[in-house]
Design a protein with these regions (language model features):
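Glycine/small-residue-rich loop that forms an oxyanion/phosphate-binding "nest" at active or ligand-binding sites
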Residues: 65-111
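Hydrophobic alpha-helical
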Residues: 175-208, 221
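Conserved beta-alpha
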Residues: 96-161, 241-242
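N-terminal glycine-rich anion-binding loop in soluble enzyme alpha/beta folds
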Residues: 1-64, 135-170
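Short, well-structured alpha-helical segments in soluble
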Residues: 59-72, 173-186
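Hydrophobic alpha-helical segments within soluble ligand-binding/sensing domains
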Residues: 61-63, 106-123, 219-230
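Short, flexible loop segments at boundaries between secondary-structure elements
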Residues: 160-165, 209-233
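Periplasmic-binding protein-like
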Residues: 75-80, 128-130, 186-193
């Protein structure tokens, strides 16, 4: 048997995601360097609408779901839901991550924390935020980013209420939406939502807009790799992965 035919698994990343999410694990498996695996576990979401109520329910049920995910013996966990992990405000995202770490014994980062760390890593101060969401969630995300030290130049959403519609928006549509709706000068563009195919559009947006673009899944992947101490290049990872630590 040729041992070289077997992939050596260096580390596992556990993804804790809402039950409606079909994009995050696909993105991780597409972009993770060889030797790293992603394993997802879903938090059942009783409502198929993207509202504060539905995100609060995901947050409330995340602890028990994380304990199940821990059975994969993941080396790190990502709580992959932007809208849920901002709900406790600036700094609350880290508290959420710590609660999950304490419950599982596995280092955990939330998408909200990953986004803040990514924007700071890029030295972004003025951030344009574009999302699939309605304004109810957009305003909460704006407040979170502003309280985290950023000037949010705009918070523009596609006004999608039904969660199952969000992953149906293709990367070409996302590219055109961001390009057409970006109004004010900014240091970076943040495209929110882990169930949104924004990472696929990222290289084209960075090339055309001339500023770094951060997406929820890209930032989450970057933060997970940092937790693992991995410095492997990520093809298609964008400016975030190119900036030295």
């Amino acid at each position: 048997v040729n041992a070289g035919a077997f992939e050596v698994i260096r580390a596992r990343i556990g993804l804790l995601i809402p039950s409606v999410n079909v994009v995050m694990e696909t993105d991780f498996r597409r972009y993770l360097p060889p030797g790293l695996q992603a394993h997802a576990h879903r938090v059942y979401r009783r409502s198929l609408q993207s509202t504060h109520e539905s995100e609060n329910q995901v947050l409330a049920d995340s602890l028990e779901a994380a304990k199940a995910l821990a059975h994969t013996r993941a080396d790190v966990i990502v709580f992959g839901c932007t809208a849920a992990t901002i709900l406790e405000g600036a700094g609350g995202d880290r508290i959420i991550g710590q609660r999950l770490t304490d419950a599982t014994g596995i280092p955990t980062v939330t998408t909200a924390t990953a986004v803040v760390e990514a924007l700071r890593h890029l030295n972004a101060r003025r951030v344009a935020m574009l999302t699939p969401y309605r304004d109810e969630i957009n305003e909460t995300e704006r407040e979170f980013l502003q309280a985290s030290g950023f000037e949010v130049t705009q918070a523009t959403g596609m006004q999608i209420l039904e969660s199952l519609r969000i992953p149906q928006v293709g990367p070409g549509q996302i590219y055109r939406f961001v390009r057409d709706e970006l109004k004010e000068p900014c240091d970076a563009v943040f495209i929110s939502c882990t169930n949104f195919r924004a990472w696929e559009a990222l290289p084209y947006l960075e090339a055309d807009l001339g500023v770094p673009v951060v997406t929820s899944n890209q930032a989450s992947c970057w933060a997970a790799l940092r937790l693992l101490g991995e410095s492997c290049p990520v093809r298609g990872g964008g400016r975030l992965f190119e900036e030295p630590a």
